[in-house]
Amino acid sequence: MQAGKALKTAAAFMLSVAMLATGAACGTSDDSDASASKSSSKSSELTGYDVSGVKKDDAIAKMLPDYVTKDGKLTIGMDTSYAPAEFLAADGKTPVGFDVDIAKALAGVFGLEADPETANFDSIIPAVGAKYDIGISSFTVTKERLEAVDFVSHFNAGSAWAVKKGNPNKVDTSDLCGKKVAVQTATMQETAANKMAKQCKADGKAEMDVISSKLQTDVTTNVVTGKADVFYADSPVAGYAIAQTDGELETLGKTEGIAPEGIVVKKGDQQMDEALQK
């Protein structure tokens, strides 16, 4: 299902703003090096797009199911390790990023208070319709996910590879056997990487080590610190990380696998589906 005009316009604008920003970077895990920590502080300085002018649309608000409107809040599950889409501000608590702004804009249209909640990426889809009203966290629309939930797509993105500057480990994405590949847990990139690893084994080649992390910030850090040879992520996230790590990372190859990304809705919830498409 496709998003309505307002949602698509907001998504395109906020994504372009985020990708043009030059004063921010992915955060890091506790074991990151000094340069990665420095880039983390930059990430926290980003401010969101002002959506306070978004007004309630009574006709759309009336379409919402009771379970969404009863508490006056739009509760959104999101993985806040995924800059520039969603990450935490300098206080370490406040979600910011273009997905957060989209969530706030939607809440404004619905006449609700936006309540973005931090969650591990792989825990969001199972909780939509119960703990969360919707999920917004750069979810690629896949056949497998559509078996569990509905999606309203709002923009397209691909996947990209990132390595240390100069590709010192001679990574060739056409043959990753013998390499260490960092990915985020439960992403389509993890699925693809595991498939490649199985093929290496089937072909009798050197083992490909897939390093999965719950947080995208840790995925990026694994390459910066040398724990992994390359990471594989959504193209906006990869491009953002590369641009903001003080020249430590670079893109390897071209963006591939362009596919729709979307907002997660409870399976069969026609009211919410239609409200998001207006």
Could you describe each region identified by the protein language model?
Residues 27, 41-58, 108, 167, ...:
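Extended ligand-binding regions for polar small-molecule ligands
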Residues 113-174:
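Acidic, polar ligand-binding/catalytic clefts
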Residues 22-38:
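Bacterial lipoprotein signal-peptidase II cleavage site
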Residues 1-24:
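Sec-dependent bacterial lipoprotein signal peptides
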Residues 95-108, 139-141, 157-215, 230, ...:
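Bilobed "Venus flytrap"/periplasmic-binding protein-like clamshell domains
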Residues 139-146, 194-195, 224-257:
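A ligand-binding cleft/hinge motif common to bilobed small-molecule-binding domains
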Residues 42-135:
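Extracytoplasmic small-molecule ligand-binding "clamshell" domains
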Residues 80, 155-163, 243-277:
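Periplasmic-binding protein-like
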